[in-house]
Structures are given as C-alpha cells and as structure tokens.
Amino acid sequence: MKALTKMHAIAGATLLTMVSCNNISESQKADIVLENIFARKSVRKFTSEPVSDKQVETLLRAAMAAPSAKNGQPWRFVVVNDKDKLASMDKQLPYARLDTAPMAIVVCGDLSGYKKFWTDDCSAATENLLLAAEAMGLGAVWTAASDEERSGIVREALGLPENIHPLCVVPVGHPDGDFQPKDKWDPSKIHYNQW
C-alpha cells in the first residue's frame, strides 16, 4: 500500500508540474485537470503515515487560489495535527472521521470583513483543497461544521474567536483502502433557458 501511495504522490506532483508546463497543449492540460476532478472521492479511512509539511503547504496554497467575492479572501485555516485534539474532536464530530486521520484542516470564514458570500468563497477554497489532495495521492473528505451544534464544538475545541466561523472539517491523510469515485452525472438535473 505504501508503494501505491508513493506512486500517487509522484503522479500528483507530475500532474501539477505538467499542468503548469507550457510545452503541452491546452487539450492535454484540460484532460489532466478533468481526469483529476472526475477521480476525486471521499476518503474516510487513513494509514498512519503523516502528511508532510510541504504537502500541507501545497494544499493550503491550492485552497487560497480559489476565487472570492470582491477578492475578499475571507478564508482562514486551522491545521490540526495534535492526536489528542483530533481524538477529542472525533468523539464529538462522528461524521468527521478523525479517528484514523493524521491531520485535518478546518476551513473557516472571517466574518469581520465583507461577509455576504463567505460560505461561497470558503466552499470554493475547500473544493480546491480536495482536488489538490486527489492530485497529490492523498485522501480527504468534506465534513460539515457550519450548523450551530457542530460549529460550537469546533469553536470550543480550537478556541476560535467570535469573528471566525467554521465551515467544514477536512480530514486529510494517505488512503487506507481502495476508494473509488462515484459517477454522479445525471442529465435529468439540467435545464436550459428555463425550468
């Protein structure tokens, strides 16, 4: 399994390098990006292998590359890699599946500035984070934390100030198992020009 994970990491690094290279066609770039989007899946079980500091930085750089309303960039991130804190949060947030994750990234919005579209902006940042994890051979899953009960748990566990509101908790790690993406294409959900 470790060999497969390392192979994914190499493939992810290659993917990111290839997409930024100027010597491949626009069509090839599109194929690489779309393949990564369609390969993304929710991973809820992880090996004990840690996520490197460099990988964490890459994930956060990808998240911060997201678009935001009026370029407000309201996102704030809390990286949680303390095992005791993860275990404590796991007991109170059972859907977050933090029990095997070596780390989690909590995506939050700063409501002290332009806050009208903070959930949209932070959602875009979260999706970028998930796609970067996929490209790097890591696993991750978006778990909601914005409702009153869950946000209170996260706020207390992390000591968040009043102006910082959690959107989601994203456990990240090396997948333990063979997780497959789901084909969610459904043309019946598409309408043109009117309902």
Q: Where does each model-flagged region fall?
A:
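Acidic, surface-exposed loops and disordered segments
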Residues: 2-11, 17-195
